[in-house]
């Protein structure tokens, strides 16, 4: 049976989620961050983490952005095949929600044309990823992405012979090269397989996973654990000033790939790993 959803309902939810994601970190991120404060061995690193923790608290209580870079809006939509949208197109509804959220929420407008650098003045357009699923609901994830860490992200088109050791080295290379520029402690999304664009999309989506969920089964889960340990042994530390907590998590997504390739994308996010989730 077809279920009708009004475009304005999508717009309203996107607006609220843009503001929410920029003011308050999800509970899983806050819990992992608190744990990092306890685990950090460096006195300077712990001091930095405590300052960042205080910043998170102030932002949530005063309803102000956690970071001055309120990001480019990345939206993941899982649209049930039994949904009919009435009152406008889905893309227009999403972008209107981003416009309303950033303008009415007084969030920084950071989106410009790529060459002439003219600002669009409302943080649109969003980057929208669509997936058709069963059912009559729309699953929405809003993930504002700041560009300090985005600029440190990498894609590696490895050879099949590079294997799992090549994947490990690719991730460690990206993190080493990022150093303090990604505002550590980081959350690291890794996409393995697919094509050039598929691995990048997976790496981005991996950042939205609830950090308190069970890790993936098989080699991906083991690789997450190993890479997190290796990354934290790099000693980059909070703020890039040294310490035992360089990353809060490594999240991996995989997809089958061509016999001739091994694409790997590493999407780095700073400690302000923002995402809001709703189902309508």
Label each region the model flagged.
Residues 1-190, 195-280:
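Non-transmembrane, aqueous-exposed alpha-helical and coiled segments at domain scale
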């Amino acid at each position: 049976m077809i279920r009708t959803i009004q475009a304005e309902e999508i717009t309203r939810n996107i607006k609220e989620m843009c503001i929410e994601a920029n003011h308050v970190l999800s509970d899983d991120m806050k819990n992992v961050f608190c744990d990092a404060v306890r685990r950090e061995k460096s006195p300077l690193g712990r001091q930095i983490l405590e300052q960042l923790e205080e910043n998170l608290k102030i932002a949530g209580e005063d309803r102000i952005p956690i970071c001055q870079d309120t990001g480019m809006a990345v939206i993941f939509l899982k649209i049930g095949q039994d949904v009919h949208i009435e009152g406008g197109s889905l893309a227009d509804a999403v972008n209107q929600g981003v416009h309303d959220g950033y303008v009415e929420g007084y969030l920084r407008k950071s989106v410009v044309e790529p060459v002439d650098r003219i600002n669009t003045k409302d943080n649109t357009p969003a980057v929208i990823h669509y997936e058709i699923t069963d059912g009559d609901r729309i699953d929405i994830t809003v993930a504002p992405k700041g560009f300090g860490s985005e600029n440190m992200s990498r894609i590696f088109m490895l050879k099949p012979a590079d294997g799992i050791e090549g994947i490990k080295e690719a991730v460690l290379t990206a993190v080493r090269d990022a150093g303090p520029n990604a505002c550590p402690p980081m959350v690291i999304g890794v996409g393995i397989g697919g094509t050039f664009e598929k691995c990048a999309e997976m790496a981005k989506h991996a950042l939205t996973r609830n950090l308190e969920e069970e890790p993936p089964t098989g080699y991906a889960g083991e690789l997450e654990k190993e890479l997190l340990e290796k990354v934290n042994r790099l000693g980059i530390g909070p703020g890039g000033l040294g310490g035992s907590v360089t990353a809060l998590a490594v999240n991996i997504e995989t997809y089958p790939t061509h016999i001739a390739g091994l694409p790997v994308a590493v999407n780095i996010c700073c400690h302000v790993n923002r995402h809001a989730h709703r189902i309508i």
